[in-house]
UniProtKB/Swiss-Prot annotation:
This is Putative [LysW]-L-2-aminoadipate/[LysW]-L-glutamate phosphate reductase. Pfam families: Semialdhyde_dh, Semialdhyde_dhC_1. NADP(+) binds at S9, G10, Y11, I12, N314. GO terms for biological process: arginine biosynthetic process via ornithine; L-arginine biosynthetic process; lysine biosynthetic process via aminoadipic acid. It comes from Picrophilus torridus (strain ATCC 700027 / DSM 9790 / JCM 10055 / NBRC 100828 / KAW 2/3). It catalyses: [amino-group carrier protein]-C-terminal-N-(1-carboxy-5-oxopentan-1-yl)-L-glutamine + phosphate + NADP(+) = [amino-group carrier protein]-C-terminal-N-(1-carboxy-5-phosphooxy-5-oxopentan-1-yl)-L-glutamine + NADPH + H(+); [amino-group carrier protein]-C-terminal-gamma-(L-glutamyl-5-semialdehyde)-L-glutamate + phosphate + NADP(+) = [amino-group carrier protein]-C-terminal-gamma-(5-phospho-L-glutamyl)-L-glutamate + NADPH + H(+). The lineage of its organism: Archaea, Methanobacteriati, Thermoplasmatota, Thermoplasmata, Thermoplasmatales. Keywords: Amino-acid biosynthesis, Arginine biosynthesis, Cytoplasm, Lysine biosynthesis, NADP, Oxidoreductase. It is found in: Cytoplasm. The keyword Oxidoreductase applies. The active site is at C149.
Amino acid sequence: MQVGIVGGSGYIAGQLLRMLAFHKDIEIKIVSSKSHAGEKLSRVHPDLLNILDLRFSDMDPVDLASRVDLVFLALPHGTSINYVPDIYEIGTKIIDMSADFRLKDPDLYREWYGFEHNYPDLLEKFVYGMPEFHRNEIKNSRYVSVPGCIASSTIYSVAPFSMLNLDNNIVTVDAKVGSSGSGSGTDSSKNYSERYNSVRAYKPVHHRHTPEIEQEIKYISGKNIKIAMSAHSVNMVRGILTTSNIFIDLDEPDALSQLREFYKNEKFIRLIFDRKSNFRYPDPKTVIGTNFADLGVISDGYIKRIVSLGAIDNMIKGAAGNAIQSMNIMNHFDESEGLLIPAAFPV
């Protein structure tokens, strides 16, 4: 199958290229970047030297989409929406990496992303790209919207407990994110000198992944659970650790059993419970470069809560990995093709 990538110079596109290069069912045909047109991919993605001998194209996204079987849109939020309607008319399969088609309620885009969504009919066409919860829908769809990275880690952590009797139906989430989560732009706050030795509360309230987390948890549990999230940038390049406080009276063996049973058939979900290991709880260090989500849970009887931990690579399980897993399902490939890669350890 021939695929193309629009917005090929960003970090997420780089991870798509790294994994698709070794996918036995895929030919990468066109990769576009207006700012790097004509340059070799390896100039921007040096890890691809001697791996992919391609150059960036400046081809119009719709024209590009017409020449491939499936297109990945790796564009900033609010940009994909300008091209999807025309690509939809062509009939090319779409996997959108932005937030433009994640939310089912178009009014939420005004509140959380600052733009009007004028294509509510297309919102219904896109499936939320979490294979663990939408496998059958993805299998029968041509259009997938990949979840946000913090949203992914939070949903994986909270979902197994969301159908239980939570106190007040409120979950508090502390998210710690590496610098690559901000993308490859030139904002000075991303500079090494600004971020090094810093733990910055960059979004202590009103994080824009909140509505998609609440939307997905309602889909899974049928309940309106509120998410109170605070997000921090930390001194690492890639990875996310979410710590979710779920207020429920549940002892640790039962909490672990709930988590284990919920994900018992999921190859890319790993339960971390080894109190003698250096990594006794989920840690981003052990998932870097992989499509795994590492989950763990601890019970706190003192105030009747459980603490559910999730660690993912923000650029893989939080973006490119889930995109490729969804692509595999959509096209009836082996779901794990191109994705069973262990972490580089130590790093």
